[in-house]
Amino acid sequence: MAEQEPKELLEMSTDTERLLEENDLRPLWEVEKDFGNQFGGFEADIWKWEDIQASIDAIERDVPIADLPPGFQRRVAVPVNTGYRNAISNTIYVGVQTVSPGETAPAHRHGANALRFTIDGSEDMKTVVAGEEFPMRDNDLITTPQWEWHDHVNDGDETAAWLDVLDLPLVLDSLNARNTFENHELDRQPVTKSQGYWESQYGRARPFEDTKEDGIPGPFEGNCAATPPYRFSWKDTLQTLRQRAENDDPDPHDGYSLSYVNPATGQPPLFPTMSFRAQLLQEETDPHFHNAVDAYFVIEGEGATHVGDDVLEWSERDIFVIPPDEIHHHDPDGEAILLGMTDRPVFEAFNFYAEAEP
């Protein structure tokens, strides 16, 4: 007797197939093969800074912010992955935004969490969040948290540029949630707090009487601590990173790294959905893999990251992404510093994060 193929063993009668179809039902062995394929084709990818720079310069020449439609008054070039055409990954959005001298990117707020990592900044370039002006110096990281008013004001004489990083793909696509969004009635929100206010509420020294609101802002509920507006000075971050390199042993996979913490808790992740770290690499790292997405911005230096059979050769200001479950390691040419971005907190929230060496 000839051995039957699995498909023949699972073959249903025409009547059974019709019955299931009429009632919008499918057998498990047919639907399970469709799971996990929604974002098929997600690849390791890299965007070179010279290409990004040329693109944002061209957009700046062609499109004044004031000409953009309400709600989209942000001049941004968005890296899109080959296998996912809206963003760098299915959970993390990265964009490069510019504001010309004298321009304002008008105040708005949204349900997605966001941060700004300054590429070209100055004392006269400010992001205003929840009433405080935060100066945007090179490599400073500024949070613009969920449902907080924020606008970007360039009172200097040079174009400013920075990374926008949001959890928009996770919220809008993976979770299929509504994009809760609101424009402020003014282009520039009123500055109601002196510089340093939010640091005084959440920095090393805090008010004796804790009167700040700990609740999640806006029409949202949950169990995670809300992330406040905050500016992480690159001067302080780099100093601490150097201290680590002088006194500690490097992680075999990530080198010397510092996690940006939620100022309200003093612990990572910075947001419930995304975690960020500054990584100092001085030598080749050991290969590993994990089920979270890793995206990177090169702050200083050059080198290569090996992802499976691909080699991503990077230099200062390049952006690259590593898909889940791909074996990878970094190989800097001398010393390099990276900004690492990951959706690992999402997996950890479900006790589902996994990491291993090959």
From Swiss-Prot:
Its EC number is 1.13.11.4. Keywords: Aromatic hydrocarbons catabolism, Dioxygenase, Oxidoreductase. InterPro entries: Cupin_1 (IPR006045), Cupin_2 (IPR013096), GDO-like (IPR047183), RmlC-like_jellyroll (IPR014710), RmlC_Cupin_sf (IPR011051). Optimum pH is 7.2. It catalyses: 2,5-dihydroxybenzoate + O2 = 3-maleylpyruvate + H(+). CDD domains: cupin_GDO-like_N (cd02216). Pathway: Aromatic compound metabolism; naphthalene degradation. Inhibited by 2,2'-dipyridyl. Catalyzes the oxygen-dependent ring fission of gentisate between the carboxyl and proximal hydroxyl groups at positions 1 and 2 of the aromatic ring to form maleylpyruvate. No activity with cathechol and protecatechuate as substrates. Part of a 3-hydroxybenzoic acid-degradation pathway. This is Gentisate 1,2-dioxygenase. It comes from Haloferax sp. The lineage of its organism: Archaea, Methanobacteriati, Methanobacteriota, Stenosarchaea group, Halobacteria.
